[in-house]
Structures are given as C-alpha cells and as structure tokens.
C-alpha cells in the first residue's frame, strides 16, 4: 500500500472515530397517547446509529415512561407494549386514563435493568401540595415553567422506586390521583411533570444542561406539531449546543382543548398508536435523508 493510501486510511479512521464517539442526549416531552410517536423516532434513531450513542434520556409524563422503556427494554418489546398492552390496559374499566392499567403494564417491564443502562435516565414530576397556590403564582408572577419541577434520576433506584416515579410523572391532573414518592425528603405526593400551568416542565432539558456539559448534541422530541406546540427549546439559549428538534408532521391535537384531550392525549387505540409509531419513524428518516445521511449497520453497538 502506498504512503498516500496509508495516510488517507488513517485520516478516515480518525474521522470515523470522532463522529462515532459523539454523545447525544434525548429529551422527550409529554402528551399521553401521543407518546407512541416517540417510539417511531427511537426506531429510526437506532437504524441510523444515533440511539446507541444516547447517554442521557430525560422525559416527562409519557416521555418519562418512554425514557424508562428505551433504557431497559428492546425496541421490539417497547413497540409491543404500546401496540398490545396500552390500548386495553390504559382504558381499563372505561376510564379516560387508567392508573391501575398503567401499573399492571409497569409490573411486566424489567425496570430494575435501568441500573445497567448505558444511558442515565431522568423523569420529571410536580410536588402535589399547594397546586392551587402554584397556579395562582403563575398567573400573578408570569411563567412558572419548571419552577416547581423535580427531576428524578432512576439509575440507582429499586424497581418499586422507579415504578412510583413513573406513575407520578404520568399522573394527569384531575383524571389521575397523585402518587406518593419516597424522594429522600420525607416523601411527598407528586403528579404529572409536564403540567406547566403549575410549574412543571414539559421539555425537561435541564438535567442534561446542568449535569452533562460535555454533551453537545441534544435531540428534543415534541408531541405537538409546530403550529400547536406551546413552547420550544431555542438553541440560542444554550451556547455551543446542537439542538435537534423533531415535531410530528401531522396535527395530533385538533382545534380545541377538548379535541386535544380525547383525540390526542387520551387516545390509546391500537390504530392510532400504530399510525403514530409509523409517523415518528417516517419523520425522523425524512430528517436524515434531507441531510444526506443513511442508515448504518449497528451490530457493533449491541
């Protein structure tokens, strides 16, 4: 081999090593049944070799549940849970959102495997006490987004501790009961971490920014299209951070809060879930194709 070919081979290997050593963080917003969209995004991220480089996952509500699933289950099992378990158990006893059904699903998931996960996993919840005062505070003093959010790391928790935090982050206000969490501060009741009207954080990027300054690529997956999303992360707010945003390319919310709840957040039908998984996959693949990126064989990551 000529010296030139040797040199080019070395350069290629160095570039390859740099590209594939990049770390990513994944931020998953909440949205109930719309969370199926994130499963499709994750599927595409695996095909393109990105999911294997995600070292932090931070989620709230449905995004928190997915954060845990992605860290302790295979993609195939996560997809099966959404398609086969969620439609029947989340609407158990004809409830809009069944906490009992979610509890049954979580009992079948190996949550204890999160401690062995490559990725650090965080979920967000809002302490339940004084909800009304928090709501009034937000109205009197302007935005309270994130002011009352608690960010829980799951990697060192037991099965029961993880389960309680997942039930808490997904405890939709009014519809669901708040959940007791042993939080190291005497224990408190918590509810949906994505409810920003009472100080929650539906785009929980904070644990990544504050805890992992070395991560320069952050993927944010929203569960509303750009027309309906109430808040989005701005790259200009974070110095030298590459913010990669994914929005559903279709309207998941409808034209009213009522439609958003019934047709979006509380829609757990198998057909809807299947559609959202496919749409999340297609939107993510489209993002990569427009940037002339292609799937990679990822067997060396497994």
Language model feature labels by segment:
Residues 20-57, 68-302:
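Patatin-like phospholipase
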Residues 12-13:
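Short, linear, compositionally biased motifs with a strong N-terminal bias
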Residues 59, 63:
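Gly/Ala-rich beta-loop-alpha elbow adjacent to hydrolase catalytic centers
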Residues 1-8:
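Bacterial N-terminal signal peptides that target proteins for export
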């Amino acid at each position: 081999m000529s010296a030139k070919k040797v040199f080019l081979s070395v350069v290629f290997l160095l570039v390859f090593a740099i590209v594939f050593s990049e770390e990513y963080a994944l931020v998953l917003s909440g949205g109930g049944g719309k969370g199926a969209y994130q499963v499709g995004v994750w599927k595409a991220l695996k095909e393109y070799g990105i999911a294997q480089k995600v070292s932090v996952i931070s989620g709230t509500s449905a995004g928190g549940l997915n954060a845990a699933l992605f860290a302790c289950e295979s993609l195939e099992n996560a997809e099966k849970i959404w398609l086969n378990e969620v439609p029947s158990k989340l609407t158990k006893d004809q409830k809009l959102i069944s906490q009992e059904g979610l509890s049954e699903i979580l009992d079948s998931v190996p949550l204890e495997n999160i401690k062995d996960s490559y990725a650090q996993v965080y979920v967000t919840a809002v302490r339940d006490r004084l909800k009304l005062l928090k709501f009034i505070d937000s109205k009197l003093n302007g935005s309270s987004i994130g002011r009352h959010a608690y960010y829980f790391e799951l990697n060192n928790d037991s099965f029961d501790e993880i389960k309680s935090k997942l039930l808490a982050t997904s405890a939709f206000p009014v519809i669901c009961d708040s959940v007791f969490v042993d939080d190291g501060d005497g224990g408190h009741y918590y509810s949906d971490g994505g409810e920003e009207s009472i100080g929650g954080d539906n785009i929980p990027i904070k644990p990544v920014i504050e805890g992992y300054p070395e991560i320069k690529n952050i993927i944010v997956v929203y569960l509303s299209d750009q027309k309906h999303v109430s808040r989005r992360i701005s790259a200009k707010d974070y110095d030298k951070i590459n913010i990669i945003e994914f929005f559903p390319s279709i309207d998941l919310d409808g034209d009213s809060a009522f439609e958003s709840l019934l047709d979006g957040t509380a829609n757990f039908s198998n057909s809807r879930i299947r559609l959202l998984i496919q749409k999340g996959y297609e939107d993510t693949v489209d993002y990569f194709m427009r940037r002339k990126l292609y799937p990679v064989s990822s067997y060396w990551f497994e």
